[in-house]
């Protein structure tokens, strides 16, 4: 059996950088406002994986009202969520992540993001796709107010 999940996340810019996206620190003059480390890519991916096996979302598993997750490393959250996906008898078939940001440029960091995600999900890097786009200067991402991300995860019965 295969199942598909979709995830979305957004964080506004605020404070000082760097930012963490896809598990990779990216130099930037602005930071991202968040309860955890603000990694929109891993948050969207975590939601996609949890959704694929009907385990809710990242906020249910790691509530932002719980101080133990203040400043949390999103790679650790992703790994914990994936452990729960595996406990339901599923493993990653493939994942696809789309980062939406006017700046900073993501292309130089994509390979490192793919490697980090593949490591966290204990899968082959060929099962992980990460891409970036802009919103052509439209909306909050186009105005440089924040970053958004969508992710899709296909999981297969182990």
Swiss-Prot record:
User: Which GO-annotated molecular functions does the record name?
Assistant: 2-C-methyl-D-erythritol 2,4-cyclodiphosphate synthase activity; metal ion binding
Q: Which cofactor does it need?
A: a divalent metal cation
Site entry: Transition state stabilizer = 35, 134
Q: In which pathway does it act?
A: Isoprenoid biosynthesis; isopentenyl diphosphate biosynthesis via DXP pathway; isopentenyl diphosphate from 1-deoxy-D-xylulose 5-phosphate: step 4/6
Q: Which gene encodes it?
A: ispF
**Keyword annotations of the record:** Isoprene biosynthesis, Lyase, Metal-binding
Q: Which residues bind 4-CDP-2-C-methyl-D-erythritol 2-phosphate?
A: 9-11, 35-36, 57-59, 62-66, 133-136, 140, 143
Which Enzyme Commission numbers does its entry carry? 4.6.1.12
What name has this protein been given in UniProt? 2-C-methyl-D-erythritol 2,4-cyclodiphosphate synthase
Task: Specify whether ATP-binding is a keyword of the entry.
Answer: no
Keyword flag Lyase: yes
Q: Which ranges does the record mark as transmembrane?
A: none
User: Which residues belong to the signal peptide in this entry?
Assistant: none
**Biological process, per Gene Ontology:** isopentenyl diphosphate biosynthetic process, methylerythritol 4-phosphate pathway; terpenoid biosynthetic process
One of the Pfam families matching this protein, by short name: YgbB
Origin organism of this chain? Pasteurella multocida (strain Pm70)
HAMAP family per record: IspF
Q: Which residues bind a divalent metal cation?
A: 9, 11, 43
Function statement: Involved in the biosynthesis of isopentenyl diphosphate (IPP) and dimethylallyl diphosphate (DMAPP), two major building blocks of isoprenoid compounds. Catalyzes the conversion of 4-diphosphocytidyl-2-C-methyl-D-erythritol 2-phosphate (CDP-ME2P) to 2-C-methyl-D-erythritol 2,4-cyclodiphosphate (ME-CPP) with a corresponding release of cytidine 5-monophosphate (CMP).
Annotated cofactor note? Binds 1 divalent metal cation per subunit.
Give the UniProt family note: Belongs to the IspF family.
């Amino acid at each position: 059996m295969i199942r598909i999940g979709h995830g979305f996340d957004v964080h506004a810019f605020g404070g000082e950088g760097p930012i963490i996206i896809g598990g990779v620190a990216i130099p930037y003059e602005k930071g991202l406002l968040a309860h955890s480390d603000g990694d929109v890519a891993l948050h969207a991916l975590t939601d996609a994986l949890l959704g694929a096996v009907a385990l809710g979302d990242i906020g249910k598993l790691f509530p932002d009202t719980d101080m133990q997750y203040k400043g949390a490393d999103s790679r650790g959250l992703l790994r914990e969520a994936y452990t729960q996906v595996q406990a339901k008898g599923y493993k990653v078939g493939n994942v696809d992540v789309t980062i939406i940001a006017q700046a900073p440029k993501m292309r130089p960091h994509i390979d490192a993001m793919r490697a980090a995600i593949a490591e966290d999900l204990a899968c082959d890097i060929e099962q992980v796709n990460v891409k970036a786009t802009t919103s052509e200067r439209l909306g909050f991402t186009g105005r440089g107010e924040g970053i958004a991300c969508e992710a899709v995860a296909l999981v297969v019965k182990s």
